[in-house]
Amino acid sequence: MNGIINLKKEAGMTSHDAVFKLRKILGTKKIGHGGTLDPDVVGVLPIAVGKATRMVEFMQDEGKIYEGEITLGYSTKTEDASGEVVAETPVLSLLDEKLVDEAIASLTGPITQIPPMYSAVKVNGRKLYEYARAGQEVERPERQVTIYQFERTSPISYDGQLARFTFRVKCSKGTYIRTLSVDLGEKLGYAAHMSHLTRTSAAGLQLEDALALEEIAEKVEAGQLDFLHPLEIGTGDLVKVFLSPEEATEVRFGRFIELDQTDKELAAFEDDKLLAILEKRGNLYKPRKVFS
């Protein structure tokens, strides 16, 4: 069994939980996911099965799209709605929506983020959330990410001394939307957190086409495997090249070939089928991963 699954992850489930359950449903151990989702986040979780597990790193490289809600008025340990409140700054007057939108615009393009303590980023061989649960604070390395689009998608609503609005973000891999929410709050002068989040697109897969675990289990029971997408969709943003029969033969034998290309990595096709991922070495391309 080989292919890519567009899984609709539910709230309360880790990405690892989803993989574990799919292994049981599909009866295979060779399964991985293309981009972690926090337990409280719902939406698209790309799943690679069989040969497609070799595509995971490229699936992760493609941009992701999220829709969610930001709450101004208090912040939490985890930077989302599940965490303990650590700071409060009551919203006592109506916010200027123009200033809010200007602050949002200032967080687009290449930006620097510091990963939250409650995250799976590793420092000195340990995940940050392990330090956090032990009550330890460690220095976290900055990381460069890109926010391609960040926009407010609703009027600002008010609930007591809190203000809320929904948003849409298109971003690069490694972006923490929780941290983006907190950083926006700081620019506006308020403690803030991400109060809801849905991933609507990842690895070229869309939420409206995603299937829940129960739906996949029903299809497997009925002998229907139409939920498995071909490996080709996992090539993400890689430039695609179509090889001649002679070039394809050379690639199958692991030999270098000459191509009129400049990109560091290429997705090489034979007819309509993904044959290999090629890596530039000097003026030639070497097969990095061969699929057939």
UniProtKB/Swiss-Prot annotation:
Source taxon at top rank: Bacteria
What SUPFAM superfamilies does UniProt report for this protein, alphabetically? Pseudouridine synthase
Q: Identify the catalytic residues.
A: 38 (nucleophile)
* Gene Ontology annotations of biological process type: mRNA pseudouridine synthesis; tRNA pseudouridine synthesis
Which reaction(s) does its UniProt entry say it catalyses?
uridine(55) in tRNA = pseudouridine(55) in tRNA
Listed EC numbers: 5.4.99.25
Indicate whether Zinc appears among the record's keywords.
no
What keyword terms does UniProt attach to this protein? Isomerase, tRNA processing
The keyword Transferase belongs to this UniProt entry's keyword annotation:
no
* Gene Ontology molecular function, alphabetical: RNA binding; tRNA pseudouridine(55) synthase activity
EC category name: isomerase
The record ties this protein, via Pfam families, to: TruB_C_2, TruB_N
Q: What does this protein do?
A: Responsible for synthesis of pseudouridine from uracil-55 in the psi GC loop of transfer RNAs.
Membership in a protein family: Belongs to the pseudouridine synthase TruB family. Type 1 subfamily.
Q: What is this protein called?
A: tRNA pseudouridine synthase B
Q: Which organism is it from?
A: Streptococcus pneumoniae serotype 4 (strain ATCC BAA-334 / TIGR4)
Q: What is the lineage of its organism?
A: Bacteria, Bacillati, Bacillota, Bacilli, Lactobacillales
